[in-house]
């Protein structure tokens, strides 16, 4: 039985004498995910494997390989963040030709549904639907369906104008009227668009602008149904020029009684990735198992969520210290599609994002991912184009990463060198307390000058009452320069360092 004091990995600990201990696992394949039971009397952990619907832990035939159990122990928190232990315990890349795998910076039809402005569903006419029997053609549109032709074109135009690679579109396919909470097996077919989403015309329009659409496959956790349609769904993507899919596993797993972390599901997640590779499709899996470094073996697994991402800011808010914890926990196993970039902190549903704009900018550096979203509405960025410039400039693939300072839940400052470039980017996030960072630029190439554009919280900034207060300064710097930067609680700073 999983204990009331049990915990999930990756677990970050700190002893009274300042030793940092990180516990996780690596190379989780054909095996149930591990949790840790805690005996709070003896303070000892015991491995607890996620059972299947029958209560069995797993089925293996010898010889077999179990996942690695990992421990990172250090007196310097930065070394936890820079460790490649988990990644290196995975097998080398198994995909022979990786030329089709690439980093992606994207916008999307997503935040407006999450924050209460729009909806995934097309109509309110039907409280329940059947994929092969509901007449959507004659249904009355609700007027709130976000994935419509005009709105998607608006996002495509915005992406093209500002140099983004792609546009994610959620809610394009039939079935969203009763997708959640009913444990329907045949909930989506991943093939049939709503009447107001012209899949052919929209992809042609996007491609004419130098932009691609990102497919969305919400499974509602009906994984057997997804596997039934998977090949046809991937082929549809190739037919229309998609090369990336965001998959989702919201809700209780079907087959009923299975768990997101049981052996059956672990095998399904990897099957979806390996089958996608056959079609040259990159996968960004949300609500799946927390990563264990498999992106080394299967680099088309370009992103994962598997933790409280930005969407929870629209579900009542997340404490500011959260983004100073995730790199020590969730990101130990691989990159996270955190979906940062919120500029308007007050959501249409009454929730508030507990961050400043500069705190959001910093996440593009501190939260590693080769898949980065600018999640807010185009109109919210257009009000702050000077701050938005950092999102346009920041790289998503790196040659080198350095952690300048770090303390779990309090602050993290990272510097990364853009891949194939002399440019660097720095990001710093804070938790529940204000923090002053002393940033030594000695990682820059000696003898070279850089134009530093510094985005930092204004003195009056407050993540609750004044989150849009920021100051932008420019100066010429070298490897001898030292910057002192003040961040408010829930805030941060971002710096672009462009080589001259």
List the predicted regions and their residue ranges.
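An acidic-aromatic substrate-binding cleft motif
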Residues: 61-162, 166
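N-terminal accessory beta-strand-rich subdomains and adjacent acidic, glycine-rich linkers
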Residues: 1-96
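C-terminal beta-strand-rich structural cap/linker in extracellular carbohydrate-active enzymes
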Residues: 474-500
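Conserved, mostly hydrophobic/aromatic
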Residues: 159, 283, 366, 426
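Catalytic cores of secreted or luminal carbohydrate-active enzymes
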Residues: 358-405, 494
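Solvent-exposed beta-strand/loop surfaces of large extracellular or lumenal domains
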Residues: 454-480
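Carbohydrate-binding surface patches
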Residues: 408-451, 493-494
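Aromatic- and carboxylate-enriched substrate-binding clefts and catalytic-loop regions
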Residues: 171-356
């Amino acid at each position: 039985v999983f204990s009331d004091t049990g915990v999930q990995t990756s677990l970050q600990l700190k002893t009274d004498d300042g030793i940092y201990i990180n516990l996780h696992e690596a190379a989780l394949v054909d095996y149930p995910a591990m949790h840790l039971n805690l005996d709070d009397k003896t303070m000892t952990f015991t491995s607890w494997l996620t059972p299947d619907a029958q209560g069995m832990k797993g089925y293996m035939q010898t010889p077999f390989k179990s996942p690695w159990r990992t421990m990172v122990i250090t007196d310097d928190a930065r070394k936890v963040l820079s460790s490649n232990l988990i990644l290196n315990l995975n097998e080398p890349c198994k995909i022979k030709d990786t030329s089709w795998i690439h980093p992606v910076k994207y916008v999307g039809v997503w935040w407006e549904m999450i924050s209460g402005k729009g909806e995934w569903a097309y109509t309110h006419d039907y409280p329940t639907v059947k994929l092969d029997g509901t007449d959507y053609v004659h249904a009355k549109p609700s007027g709130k369906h976000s994935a419509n032709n005009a709105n998607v074109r608006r996002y495509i135009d915005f992406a093209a104008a500002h140099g983004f690679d792609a546009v994610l579109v959620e809610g394009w396919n039939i079935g969203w009227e009763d997708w959640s909470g009913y444990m329907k097996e045949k909930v989506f077919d991943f093939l049939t668009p709503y009447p107001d989403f012209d899949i052919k015309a929209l992809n042609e329009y996007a491609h004419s602008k130098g932009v691609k659409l990102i497919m969305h496959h919400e499974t509602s956790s009906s994984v057997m149904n997804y596997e039934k349609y998977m090949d046809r769904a991937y082929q549809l993507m190739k037919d229309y020029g998609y090369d990336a899919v965001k998959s989702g596993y919201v809700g209780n797993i079907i087959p009923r009684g299975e768990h997101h972390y049981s052996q059956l599901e672990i095998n399904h997640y990897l099957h979806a990735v390996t089958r996608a590779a056959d079609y040259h499709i990159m996968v960004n899996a949300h609500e799946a198992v927390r990563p264990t470094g498999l992106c080394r073996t299967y680099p088309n697994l370009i992103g994962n969520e598997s933790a409280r991402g930005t969407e929870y800011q629209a579900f009542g808010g997340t404490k500011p210290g959260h983004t100073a914890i995730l790199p020590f926990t969730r990101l130990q196993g691989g990159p996270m599609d955190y979906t940062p970039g919120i500029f308007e902190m007050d959501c249409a549903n009454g929730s508030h994002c507990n961050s400043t704009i500069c705190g959001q900018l910093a996440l593009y550096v501190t939260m590693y991912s080769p898949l980065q979203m600018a999640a807010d509405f185009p109109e919210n960025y257009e009000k702050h184009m000077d701050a938005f410039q950092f999102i346009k400039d920041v790289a998503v693939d790196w040659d080198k990463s350095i952690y300048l300072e770090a303390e779990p839940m309090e602050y993290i400052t990272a510097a990364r060198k853009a891949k194939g470039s002399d440019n660097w980017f720095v990001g710093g996030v804070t938790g529940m307390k204000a923090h002053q960072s002393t940033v030594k630029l000695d990682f820059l190439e000696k003898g070279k000058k850089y134009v530093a554009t510094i985005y930092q919280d204004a003195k009056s900034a407050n993540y609750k009452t004044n989150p849009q207060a920021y100051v932008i300064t420019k100066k010429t710097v070298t490897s001898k320069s030292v910057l002192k930067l003040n961040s408010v609680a829930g805030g941060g700073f971002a710096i672009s360092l462009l080589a001259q």
